[in-house]
Amino acid sequence: MRTASISRRTAETDVSVSIDLDGTGKATIATGVGFLDHMLELFARHGLFDVTIKVEGDLHVDQHHTTEDAGIALGQAVAQALGDKRGIARYADIHLPMDETLSRIAIDISGRPFLVFRTSFRVEKIGQFDTELVREFFQAFAMNAGITLHVETLYGENAHHIAESVFKGLARSLRKAVAIDPREDGRVPSTKGSL
């Protein structure tokens, strides 16, 4: 089974994450940040990953540490669940519409973490959530999952729709990239023989 559990404790947060890459989209999310919970529930549902995330964070300061550390731990869990990456599709991309918004997400499960993030918001907050934290989450996730991740919003107006588009796009493209390709016949999808 391609599952993993991660616990991460710092002076700022206490995070526990579990993931099943071959799940059905079940989510149990409790970060203390309502909008982040919503985005992570979308991630689980659209990726068809079973995900449990619990964060106790220093929300009396702000939502930054909670959001970033959730991304770190989720990325670590994905990397652990993938193991040696034998048989995976490795690459995937998607154009993800959300009403007036269209975002493009591309992934390479390369073992070379990198983020290109070309998404911007016209407002600083979605409810109480700082929109700059969307990038912080994606950065933390990509670096710790060991993936190359390109995120670009081609156009969009509504900040909620933009955020939802990139989170759903991450989920849908990751779902395709981690899928087992029977033609790989259990091989690592690289001429180097490892990722």
Curated annotation (Swiss-Prot):
Pfam families in UniProt: IGPD
Gene3D superfamilies cross-referenced by the UniProt entry: Imidazole glycerol phosphate dehydratase, domain 1 (3.30.230.40)
Matching InterPro entries: IGPD_sf (IPR038494), ImidazoleglycerolP_deHydtase (IPR000807), ImidazoleglycerP_deHydtase_CS (IPR020565), Ribosomal_Su5_D2-typ_SF (IPR020568)
Database matches in PROSITE patterns: IGP_DEHYDRATASE_1, IGP_DEHYDRATASE_2
Keyword Kinase found: no
Pathway where this protein functions: Amino-acid biosynthesis; L-histidine biosynthesis; L-histidine from 5-phospho-alpha-D-ribose 1-diphosphate: step 6/9
Keywords: Amino-acid biosynthesis, Cytoplasm, Histidine biosynthesis, Lyase
Lyase found in the keyword field: yes
GO function terms (MF aspect): imidazoleglycerol-phosphate dehydratase activity
Region forming the signal peptide: none
Catalytic activities: D-erythro-1-(imidazol-4-yl)glycerol 3-phosphate = 3-(imidazol-4-yl)-2-oxopropyl phosphate + H2O
GO CC terms: cytoplasm
GO biological process, one term: L-histidine biosynthetic process
EC number: 4.2.1.19
Localisation per UniProt entry: Cytoplasm
Top EC group: lyase
Organism domain of life: Bacteria
Family: Belongs to the imidazoleglycerol-phosphate dehydratase family.
Protein name per UniProt: Imidazoleglycerol-phosphate dehydratase
